């Protein structure tokens, strides 16, 4: 008589730890790069002895690693008027990050309010707000920013206003889409049935569902805003020329690419790396929070 052996118990698949979660490596890389930039922007101008706007004609166009007339080290060299390039970049990073964060707070506030109102109440108000958003999307955001900046003039506050006006639509459309998905669910209907008011439903049921998509959009848009601020400053429509900015530094070095390539190249590379880091972080957070992408 043949004996049939019982089947061996199936081994349980190892649980996915933090390292297996989607985008973990990319998130760590991007956060490391961003943390270095933030630390340099906060601490660098305090520790560096050089004034970013002090001119030293005797030290003009020194290449990276040169010694200045007072014996100091110009790590990234100097520009056409002898200003230390590293000091300008550190101060410019502070300006760019501050402008980016302030712009996102203002644009995010406008976009979230518009998106919640349009998505939750719907009807005529929804159609009006979304048609306004469509009209703004018909114009390239950078051209709209240039037009408004030309009217307001160069100023840090004006740059924040210009970029916020140019970027609120993305937040509004994402939040509206999320609100339309959430407002018809059973737990929202149950909350209304129990007598909860509109503000209570929005605050306890709708807004928490919008946190993840808004975080993803904000991360990606922060890189776009920093790049747009540099573009406006490059054109003379952003921060004043007396305020160190990556865009101003790149603009000052564009006429010296043959003899002093470092003036425009080094800030340009630093700007590109920061924008890429925010883009990578945004993509990784999207993969982490979007359930439709977790199986890919």
Predicted ranges, named:
Residues 2-54, 132, 210-211:
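N-terminal signal-anchor/first transmembrane alpha helix
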Residues 81-296:
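Alpha-helical transmembrane segments of integral membrane proteins
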Residues 16-24, 75-78, 86, 203, ...:
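A short amphipathic helical element positioned immediately N-terminal to and/or at the very start
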Residues 1-4, 294-296:
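Short, intrinsically disordered, low-complexity terminal/loop segments
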Residues 21-22, 68, 225, 257:
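Generic structural signal for beta-strand residues in well-ordered domains
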Residues 28, 32, 36-81, 237-240:
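Hydrophobic alpha-helical transmembrane segments of membrane transport/permease proteins
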